[in-house]
Every structure is written in C-alpha cells, then in structure tokens.
C-alpha cells in the first residue's frame, strides 16, 4: 500500500487556539497551553471543542469529495491524521464515524530510536505534529 493522495488544510490547531483565546480572553500562549493541558471551563467541550470538530470534519469531507471528483477508480481505505490537533481525544473516532471511513492518528516517530539524552515520552507526544517535517526531511535525503 502506498499514499496516493495527500492534502493539507489550513484549518486546525491554530484556529482552535484563536477561538479559545477570543472566547476566554486569554493570551495566545495561555490559550495554547490550555488547549494542550486542559484547565478550561466545564462547557469547553460543548461550546468550543464539538463545534471545532464538526468544522474540521466538514473540511476533511470536502477534501475527500475533491479527491473523488478527480479519481474514478481509487477508493480511500483509511485517513491518517497529522498535526497537533489530531491528538484531540476522540477526534479520529469522530471522523471515522461521521465519514464512514477508518481514521487514525499518524505517528512517524514510533519507529525511530530515541537518543537517551531526549525525554522519550515528550518526544513521542510530538509524533503527529512532526509528520510533515519528518516527511520533508526524508524526501530531501533521497
């Protein structure tokens, strides 16, 4: 199996951070930290996160429709999510359910050996966010 189509959307963690920043009147760094570590009000999931997930699913659905309109015989068998926002709890399951296609969080770092000087857990947490950078680095080395 190989990757036959890849697309990048300009909708993701940055937009969620901006929405958190505006809604809760936080600085950019505080909003980003709250997004990653929690600590927002109890209504965060319903007021911020669920609408964000719904919008993200709409973006993915649109990208899939564009792909299918240009390819008659190829079927998408799985979505691999990347970027920091892909680690949101339940996002892959929500996408799979809404779009009726398997979805998973990609993690290119899980196959790498980590130097002992690096905190392996912190490194592993960044896997989905590093997919594009590592892919570009590997393509340059060929």
Where is each model-derived feature located?
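Hydrophobic/aromatic-enriched cytosolic interaction surfaces used to assemble or bind macromolecules
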Residues: 1-142
